[in-house]
């Protein structure tokens, strides 16, 4: 099947009006007839591997437009495929920001955040897919496309930089030896500030898309996304080699943390051990194999397949700790655990920058979704989808923070699934939301994800973070003409962008403050946004971190260290 072939005409983008009777008859057909349940789709195509000696199918599968009728079984199957394609991207940010290099939350809190991230992504994706008209206006909320929402990667370096500052100035607690203790207050400060700064993207959404792109051109957003990806690759590799907590630093890898994640963990080894490298490499190789030789459904969830292969090897070798899985509750939901919301001043400007990045990325993602869905990519309908999608991202950012999750944005990787399966139908999108919510409710699933060894998770996240960097390159390549002026602007911006990544502490003593204001200690907002703001400096000239250890440093862990001595 050639996924690039399809109907020459643009399929209708408007939703046909249906009476209650039409909906009842449609439901009966979908649930109680063979044609409505199964249809005539070539299901074998989804599972047919791409092996060199196998004959390729020459028969084109049908293209399911936005509002076309499609078999119920196919909608469920493709929805599950979309959910698997999103899974790695949804769970990675909460794992990173709640672990040893982030807020160092307890294992139960980490499990809750992973479960909630899946639930929130499912509910907020429904807003994008449904598309609501704002009464007596020309504005909409949502795209009305198969646009799914997941946790933004752009927040990770900003949040981790802010948390490091909070530990340094005493906002977050540390023990007598300087080891980080759980800091739910710090995570709550990120959420509270995120909810307020999300209003930025709400205001931006009422600007025409052309003006948005002129204010934030690709020469600004492309390098920003690229630098975020490069910064995250560094931390992904750190986890690949064993972890990102105290065990990763020679100065702190002593006593209880002489091995990663600590000496009490099963099969603990020193950071950088060849066994850890091999575990991460098994994930990386499995991802490549699934992408090269896998069936369409395997290709769309290659990252999850790689993670599964790594988990099987790690479990067989005795790297898994089941205690967290056994202790986890059977089910979970939003607000089972809460965090004290607050406004943290140094985070305001960096988070505004993050939301600006999310808005510009959303424009590109929605345009790509329209393209693969065989819908207009210009004109009033297209512009209203852009406006509705960006506005939904802003509203979703506020709702996500109130539901204890960091900013949510549209996901681009699902566009590849639409092109591959030739299905842009919203029914598959709603099924995707259903599966995400179910995965989140059953918290044993989240607990098993938290228990994954850091080296296995690092092999997966390094691949994802490299994809973020490549996305930044693609933005630059598509939207920037490489003349002398643009090269000069990029060069000037990359001086501080790459410099700050390679030498992270260069700014530590530039803005020293010795007063009583904790928000001004050691650094200001510009330092917290060490990656984002340096890239955005290019815009002034021109006008998706770490995988946390599964066992955070808690009071119980420190008591265990004392017993060992």
What is the predicted role of each segment?
Residues 2-146, 169, 180, 521-523, ...:
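N-terminal alpha-helical transmembrane segments of multi-pass membrane transport
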Residues 73-278, 455, 459-460, 472-476, ...:
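Early transmembrane hairpin of solute transport permeases
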Residues 72, 98-142, 350-426:
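Membrane-embedded helical hairpins/re-entrant loop segments and their flanking transmembrane helices
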Residues 182, 210-218, 414-432, 442-465, ...:
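Transmembrane helix-loop boundary segments of multi-pass membrane transporters
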Residues 81-82, 119-129, 157-162, 197-205, ...:
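Hydrophobic core segments of alpha-helical transmembrane domains in multi-pass membrane transport
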Residues 63-71, 338-346, 382-383:
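Helix-boundary and loop/linker segments of multi-pass membrane transporters
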Residues 2-46, 105-114, 214, 271-272, ...:
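Flexible hinge motifs at transmembrane-helix junctions and intramembrane kinks/re-entrant loops
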């Amino acid at each position: 099947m050639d996924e690039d072939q399809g109907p020459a005409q643009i399929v209708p983008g408007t939703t046909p009006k249906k009476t209650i009777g039409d909906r009842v008859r449609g439901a009966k057909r979908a649930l109680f007839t063979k044609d409505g349940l199964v249809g005539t789709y070539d299901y074998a195509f989804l599972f047919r591997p791409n092996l060199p000696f196998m004959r390729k199918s020459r028969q084109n599968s049908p293209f399911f437009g936005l509002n076309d009728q499609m078999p119920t079984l196919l909608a469920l199957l493709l929805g599950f495929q979309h959910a698997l394609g999103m899974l790695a991207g949804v769970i990675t940010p909460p794992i990173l920001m709640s672990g040893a290099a982030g807020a160092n939350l307890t294992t139960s809190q980490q499990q809750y955040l992973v479960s909630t991230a899946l639930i929130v992504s499912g509910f907020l994706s429904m807003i994008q897919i449904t598309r609501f008209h704002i009464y007596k206006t020309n504005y909409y909320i949502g795209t009305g496309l198969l646009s799914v929402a997941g946790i933004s990667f752009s927040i990770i370096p900003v949040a981790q930089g802010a948390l490091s500052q909070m530990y340094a100035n005493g906002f977050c607690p540390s023990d007598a030896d300087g080891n980080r203790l759980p800091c739910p207050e710090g995570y709550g400060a990120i959420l509270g500030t995120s909810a307020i700064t999300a209003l930025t993207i709400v205001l931006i959404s009422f600007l025409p898309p052309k003006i948005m792109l002129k204010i934030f051109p690709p020469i600004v957003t492309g390098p920003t996304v690229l630098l975020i990806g490069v910064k995250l690759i560094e931390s992904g590799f750190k986890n690949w080699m064993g972890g990102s907590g105290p065990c990763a630093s020679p100065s702190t890898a002593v006593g209880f943390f002489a091995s990663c994640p600590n000496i009490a963990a099963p099969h603990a080894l020193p950071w950088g051990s060849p066994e850890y490298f091999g575990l991460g490499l098994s994930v990386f190789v499995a991802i490549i194999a699934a992408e090269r030789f896998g069936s369409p459904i395997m290709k769309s969830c290659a990252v999850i397949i790689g993670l599964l292969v790594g988990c099987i090897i790690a479990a067989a070798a005795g790297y898994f700790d089941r205690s967290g899985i056994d202790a986890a509750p059977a089910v979970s939901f939003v607000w089972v655990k809460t965090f004290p919301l607050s406004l943290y001043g140094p985070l305001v400007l960096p988070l505004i920058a993050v939301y600006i990045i999310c808005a510009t990325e959303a424009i590109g993602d929605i345009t790509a979704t329209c393209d693969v869905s065989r819908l207009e990519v210009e004109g009033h309908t297209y512009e209203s989808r852009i406006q509705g999608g960006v506005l939904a991202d802003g509203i979703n950012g506020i709702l996500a923070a109130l539901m204890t999750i960091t900013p949510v944005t549209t996901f681009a990787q699902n566009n590849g699934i639409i092109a591959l399966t030739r299905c842009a139908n919203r029914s598959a999108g709603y099924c995707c939301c259903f599966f995400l919510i179910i995965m989140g409710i059953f918290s044993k699933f989240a607990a098993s994800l938290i228990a994954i060894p850091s080296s296995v998770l690092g092999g997966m996240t390094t691949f994802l973070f490299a994809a973020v960097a490549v996305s930044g390159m693609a933005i630059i390549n598509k939207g920037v003409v490489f003349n002398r002026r643009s090269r000069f602007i990029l060069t000037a911006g990359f001086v501080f962008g790459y410099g700050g990544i390679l030498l992270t502490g260069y700014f530590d003593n530039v803005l020293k403050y010795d007063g009583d204001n904790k928000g001004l200690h050691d650094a200001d907002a510009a330092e917290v946004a060490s990656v984002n703001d340096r890239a955005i400096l290019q815009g002034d000239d021109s006008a998706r971190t770490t995988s946390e250890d599964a066992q955070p440093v808690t009071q119980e862990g420190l008591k265990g260290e004392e017993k060992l001595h």
